[in-house]
Every structure is written in C-alpha cells, then in structure tokens.
Amino acid sequence: MSFIPVAEDSDFPIQNLPYGVFSTQSNPKPRIGVAIGDQILDLSVIKHLFTGPALSKHQHVFDETTLNNFMGLGQAAWKEARASLQNLLSASQARLRDDKELRQRAFTSQASATMHLPATIGDYTDFYSSRQHATNVGIMFRGKENALLPNWLHLPVGYHGRASSIVVSGTPIRRPMGQMRPDNSKPPVYGACRLLDMELEMAFFVGPGNRFGEPIPISKAHEHIFGMVLMNDWSARDIQQWEYVPLGPFLGKSFGTTISPWVVPMDALMPFVVPNPKQDPKPLPYLCHSQPYTFDINLSVSLKGEGMSQAATICRSNFKHMYWTMLQQLTHHSVNGCNLRPGDLLASGTISGSDPESFGSMLELSWKGTKAIDVEQGQTRTFLLDGDEVIITGHCQGDGYRVGFGQCAGKVLPALSPA
C-alpha cells in the first residue's frame, strides 16, 4: 500500500507505476513522471534516490524530456527503478513520506499536468495479429473461402506506419482529404473521407535495440519490450480501399494515430499473463516459444457524439484474443537483420474477439456499413461523424486493485476545405 491515497477503481495503484512525460503551467519543460493514484511523481526531482548498481551512474536519464534513454538501459535498470519506486512510495517507508519539502516538489496532480508523447518514436510498425479481425475483413472483401490469405497463419503480417503523425491522447484528429473511388463505374474523386473509422489496438515500446544485421532470437525478445500503451489507429476506409493495392496502406492510415500517455511496464502486466493461443499450423522454429506472453487486458471503446450527454460503449474486447504474440512480432521484425531502436513502437493491429460486440473497428461493428451501430440517445453510426469523440480504455483486474492504462481519446474535426 502507498502513502499516496489510491481509490480502488484507480488505474494507477502501486502495483502499476506507469511512466509518462508531463509538463505543468509553472514548469513548461517536459519531464519524466510516474503515475500513482491521481498524482504524478516527478522523477527528475528524486533522481538522486536511485542508488542501485544499474541506475546510480545513469540518474541523468530522469532529467531527459523523453523515456528513450531509460528504455535503452534494459531490464536490469527497469526492474531496479520499479523496486526503488515501490519502496519509496510504500506507506511503511519514511524517506519520501516524511520529507515534506521533497514531497511538495516531487508530486503534481494529474489534473494540473499536460501529457506529452512518452518517447521520440523513430519508427512505427503496425501488425495485423487478430485472427478474428483478419477473418472478418477477409470475408467482407474476399468472401468466406478466401478470408485468410495464405501467409497469415505462418507469420505476423505487418506494415511500416508513419511515426510523425502519432499523437498523444486528447489531440484532435482532422478528417483527412484524399483520393477515393466510391463508384467503381466512374473515375476516382478527391475530397473528404466519408468512411472514417477507429481501430482498437495496443502497442509496445522497444527497449534496447539490436545491431544492424543481427536478429533478435525469440528466447531474448522479452528483454527488448519495455511496456505497453493503448492505441487508436484511425483509418480512412474509402481512401484505404482505393489506394492499398499492391503495396498496402498509405494515406488511409498516415493522417493520425493516437496513443495513451502512460506506458505500463511489462512487470506490472506479468501477474495477468495467460497461456498463448494454440497456433495451427505450428510456426517455423524461429517463431516458436513456450513462454506465456499473452495478457488478460480488458478493453473498451466508447463514442461521444455532439449533443450526447455521455459516451456510449460500442465495443468490449480483450488483448488475449491476439493470435500472434509480442515476442513473435518483435522477433519476426528483426529476423532479416532490421535494427530496432529504443522508443520504436510496434502495434498489435485491430483487436477483435469472436463475439460481435468485441469487434474492434466500426468497419466490423457495422459490417462494412450495412448495420447501424446503436450509440444510444436515439443516435446510430456506421462510421464516424465530425465532432465524435472516441475513448479507448483498458485495465487488468487484480484482487482489490486494477492495473490500468488511462485513456486514449481523440475528437474528429471537420476536414479542411479543398485548396
């Protein structure tokens, strides 16, 4: 138990301690903090208290404006930092609890803070690792007989996304302009996206990277995974459908991707690990691992339109529905010698379960626009309207506590008028 009061339904008990980057009106410099209850512990203020063998010579990483250098230190430093923080925040430890002057400088209320991206994201890769999602999309566009493409059960399919347009929760998303072909009997047209979608995803940050030309074996992959965030991979379905053959997504995805600001460390998630999904056919040896690395993370998506008094839940899903694990994704990404770097972001792909209410995109929930999605208060949707706010939340439920991620939220702004 922490000396900082933590409500039972708080996302941020002492069992969590996620890392983020924040600033305040009184101190506009972005700095690294840890969430505890409704407070933020400023690590730049208490960096001198990290005196263990892994961090004593690297206290300066907590003076940085991003988490990249801390991520790059590796598991020994992460575990030491977590143990030190849990000790310092414990109700039984006087070092921070009883130092009123230090406490006053070290703690900031989350309500008064502005959150920033937790890392400088050099590269961003989006996978497509939910079997149910891939099957649903395949049925819609190719039919049941060809729902899964031949490679899907043999490797974690992915594509390189756009790192520059990843934004932190709360940043509005502008409806994109682009080229589309709504009528196949007519030439393509240019205009505002008409089929704007959200995608329920999660993503993990890479810790230490690998040398150029040297793959990461799957037995070591866990050493390179720092922690996880929620993600909304906004998608312009009409732009995407017209452009994606033969090279895959481009402008239909690159206009904006939202992530939650708090990075939940993998050690906080390990109590919620569950068995990996059965994979048939068995993957090639470089992708095989017996270590459980699938997690029971409850996820939900809510939508709040203009004129709605409260948000309506449109999806409830769970990260455990993923077919390919993060270890497999990271190993496959590096198997050709591709070098990953601290702060790189690797996303899960849309997370869908077998229950229609667990489908993680409006494309699936509306079944390609043929079914209305009830958002309560007399409103329905097939795709997103201007003014709609999408709010993703997620948590692991413990015994009397929860390890949560906060919110991943964004509001749709109208498209800019064509030039």
Swiss-Prot record:
MF (Gene Ontology): fumarylacetoacetase activity; metal ion binding
Organs and tissues of expression = Mainly in liver and kidney.
Identify the pathway: Amino-acid degradation; L-phenylalanine degradation; acetoacetate and fumarate from L-phenylalanine: step 6/6
Q: Name the Pfam families for this protein.
A: FAA_hydrolase, FAA_hydrolase_N
Quote the catalytic residue positions: H133 (proton acceptor)
Q: Which UniProt keywords apply?
A: Acetylation, Calcium, Hydrolase, Lipid metabolism, Magnesium, Metal-binding, Phenylalanine catabolism, Phosphoprotein, Tyrosine catabolism
Q: Does the keyword Magnesium apply?
A: yes
Q: What is its EC number?
A: 3.7.1.2
**Source superkingdom:** Eukaryota
Catalyzed reactions: 4-fumarylacetoacetate + H2O = acetoacetate + fumarate + H(+)
Which residues are recorded with the post-translational modification N-acetylserine? S2
| UniProt-listed NCBIfam families | fum_ac_acetase (TIGR01266)
Subunit architecture? Homodimer.
Q: What is this protein called?
A: Fumarylacetoacetase
User: Which organism is the protein's source?
Assistant: Mus musculus
